UniProtKB/Swiss-Prot annotation:
Enzymatic class: hydrolase
EC number: 3.4.21.-
Positions of disulphide bridges: 75-91, 175-248, 208-227, 238-266
UniProt family annotation: Belongs to the peptidase S1 family.
GO MF term (any one): serine-type endopeptidase activity
Active site: 90, 141, 242
Function, in words: Preferentially cleaves the synthetic substrate H-D-Leu-Thr-Arg-pNA compared to tosyl-Gly-Pro-Arg-pNA.
Chief place where the protein resides: secreted
Cited Pfam families: Trypsin
Phylogenetic lineage: Eukaryota, Metazoa, Chordata, Craniata, Vertebrata
Assigned keywords, A-Z: Disulfide bond, Glycoprotein, Hydrolase, Protease, Secreted, Serine protease, Signal
Any one Gene Ontology cellular component term annotated for this protein: extracellular space
Protein name in UniProt: Brain-specific serine protease 4
Length: 317
């Protein structure tokens, strides 16, 4: 894509504002009841659409949840502990003070046939990031969802890990996204709504900033965002995938590298998916969520290696 002028530097002050607000985290949340000790994060017990995606296998991604509004799938999210789910803040726009409208379905592979081993839990409250502006494409599009009660862990319901400070994602690192979103713009996932998955490469942030640059004003790619996907389009996240995970495997454990946030259209050429980086917001999550598990490189300090081969299948809102 030919652009006019140079894109702005990545940033926009999002993380600077965020750092000053960390100390203002709600003491009510910090004093919440101690959670039960969970199983090891990021390790499915059973191993074996997203646009251009493919069916996942049952229990392949046991931390993925369906956030439902009035009983209908609305967004995806990821389980962190027995009482906390993480997702995109924009999923609750205009409804932040109406948690009774929402519920969380865990352990479901097919939304049309969730099965007796799935669990459905109400939402107690939602904690959006304090600097999120509620504007489309804004930085800090991340929220924590407090469940009304503790869930029961099983092979179908397990937590995902957050990346520790040793994790870095160089361009062309292959990770995965998953969700129950539309398979094309305006085409919902057909019954029985089987969870879709897609392998996506990380895209250099400067390249992504150029792709989304409009020639004036602040560029939309901020320092707390990651881009991933295929420049040719055809495979991507789509409506209904918002809030779902960008997952990378490190030393046998799956880490939540990012949260599906935004993009232009679905699977359009030169419009890759944009994700909120968990590395950028790890400290905020740790201030609120007691018992969240972090994982990194076994030897410490190393970046993830980009696989020599890849491709796969995809998810967004």
């Amino acid at each position: 894509m030919v652009v006019s002028g140079a894109p702005p530097a990545l940033g926009g002050g999002c993380l600077g504002t965020f750092t000053s607000l960390l100390l203002l985290a709600s003491t009510a949340i910090l004093n919440a009841a101690r959670i039960p000790v969970p199983p090891a994060c990021g390790k499915p017990q059973q191993l074996n659409r997203v646009v251009g995606g493919e069916d996942s296998t049952d229990s392949e991604w046991p931390w993925i949840v369906s956030i439902q509004k009035n009983g209908t799938h609305h967004c995806a999210g990821s389980l962190l502990t027995s009482r906390w789910v993480i997702t995109a803040a924009h999923c609750f726009k205009d409804n932040l003070n109406k948690p009774y409208l929402f519920s969380v379905l865990l352990g479901a592979w097919q939304l049309g046939n969730p099965g007796s081993r799935s669990q459905k839990v109400g939402v107690a409250w939602v904690e959006p990031h304090p600097v999120y502006s509620w504007k489309e494409g804004a930085c800090a599009d991340i929220a924590l969802v407090r469940l009304e009660r503790s869930i029961q862990f099983s092979e179908r319901v397990l937590p995902i890990c957050l990346p520790d400070a040793s994790i870095h994602l160089p361009p062309n690192t292959h990770c995965w996204i998953s969700g129950w979103g539309s398979i094309q713009d305006g085409v919902p996932l057909p019954h029985p709504q089987t969870l879709q998955k897609l392998k996506v490469p990380i895209i250099d942030s400067e390249v992504c900033s150029h792709l989304y640059w409009r020639g004036a004003g602040q560029g939309p790619i901020t320092e707390d965002m990651l881009c991933a996907g295929y420049l040719e389009g055809e495979r991507d996240a789509c409506l209904g995938d918002s809030g779902g995970p960008l997952m990378c495997q490190v030393d046998g454990a799956w880490l939540l590298a990012g949260i599906i946030s935004w993009g232009e259209g679905c699977a359009e050429r030169n419009r890759p998916g944009v994700y909120i980086s968990l590395s950028a917001h790890r400290s905020w999550v740790e201030k609120i969520v007691q018992g969240v598990q972090l994982r990194g490189r076994a030897q410490g300090g190393g970046a993830l290696r980009a696989p020599s081969q890849g491709s796969g299948a995809a998810a967004r809102s």
